[in-house]
Amino acid sequence: MDFDSYDKKKTDLIFVGDTDNKTLGEFNIQAHPEDPEDLVNSFGNVSDDNPLLFAYVAKPAANKITFKDHPNIYNHKLYDYYAKIETRTYEEMKDKLAEYDTNYKVLDPKTSKFHEHDALGLYGNQEEGIYWVITNLVRSESNELKSLYASGESGWGYATYLDRLSKRMGEIQYQEGSEGLWIRGRYSRLGKSSYDMKWGGVQFGGDYKNTERKRIGVALAFDNGKADFNHVDGKNDLHGFNLMAYDTWRHEDGWYLDATARYGKFHNKSHVKTITERVSSNYRQSIFSLGLEGGKRIILNEEGGFFLEPQAQIQWASVGKASWKTSNDIQAKIKRGNSFIGRLGTQLGKEWIDSKNRKNNAYVKADVLHEFGNGQKAEFSADGITASRKWGAKGTWYDAGVSGQFALGKQSWAHIDLEKQFGGGLKNSWQINANIRWNF
């Protein structure tokens, strides 16, 4: 239908006198401008006090006909537009009917002339009919915009992951030998309001003792993940890698420090279904982070082997910018963003020596984490319309879990870590880490 809230005589009108329907008939109305800006202009000044009439249903059909709006599917990209539909009585509309062209023309075959008739007068008493009107144009985010936000936010969640010494290398104070190799597998589930992501990876590392108390090493990680978008029919595939260098110091009295530097890249490839098509998006971002972790293991009971280990950690991460076009020509730009996460936590556990004189342990842990950074900003534009979004802003969340290390041989160990994360908008988020280390 054609609508014009400024010149209402140009607006298309529907007239229904009666219907054979035994049950309620529901009809969609659809505006079809050449571009979204024309759609906005079509309803530019409608309101409760200035409704736009589009249909009149006479009394015989009044309880058999209803109308609803369909989203604007022509060239829509960032937003969907819905007309708010209501009904009015004759008393509410009688002073406004003169603004519309309710006449129609009929050809007289005898005279070959057209005669005008008032359509409202054809269907009985127009005072008893129902007048269907539009009172507002409601704008909502399109599936494309929702998916672009979810893809960006899930990539941020992956990029700002906070690694830890124990998850990476286990209990290195138990490990003898000047050189070591290790491999770690990890699986994470990270849920937010816009997405539910599962990702896993493998990390390989090696290090050596450059002094009696320090180890220097490097590690290479490869990750793959999938995110289901909430509220829309879409998914995101994520592939990433990173190279890490670390310098770990541990003192005999229980103190330790672990410094890390990490650089990597990840690739986001997403798609979402709209009313008319499948829209895809493809882009890459970089990651650079620096971290410092420290703590002290306090032996609570020498004979029982119970210990307490308070910990503190900070990580700064820079997530790179990206610029690309979606398959339906939405221009997308993500600006570089900075994350600064702090963690305070503790471990409480027990150490024991097995029959072969090898140390093992098990413990529970809990942490509070806070994001001090301002997150990452993005801008999406199409057809002269722009939408700005932001993710990764300040917030606090928590984790709790169980962990332990067990000797496999004289110079080999296995470490397992199970962790549940909650608060700060997280939903159904948890992580599993398992690593094996060999020393020489």
List the predicted regions and their residue ranges.
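Extracellular beta-strand/loop-rich repeat segments of large surface/secreted proteins
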Residues: 1-51, 59
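Membrane translocator/pore-forming domains, dominated by Gram-negative outer-membrane beta-barrels
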Residues: 2, 177-180, 184-440
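A structural detector for beta-sheet-dominated domains
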Residues: 2-4, 16-17, 30-32, 58, ...
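Interface/linker segment at the passenger-translocator junction
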Residues: 5, 51-56, 71-190
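Polar, low-hydrophobicity, Gly/Ser/Thr/Asn/Asp-enriched low-complexity stretches outside signal peptides
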Residues: 10, 23, 36, 64-68, ...
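Intrinsic-disorder/low-complexity loop/linker signature
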Residues: 37, 112, 384-385
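Short, surface-exposed loop/helix-turn segments at secondary-structure junctions
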Residues: 41-56, 63-66, 380-386
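Charged/polar, low-hydrophobicity segments characteristic of intrinsically disordered regions
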Residues: 61-75, 217
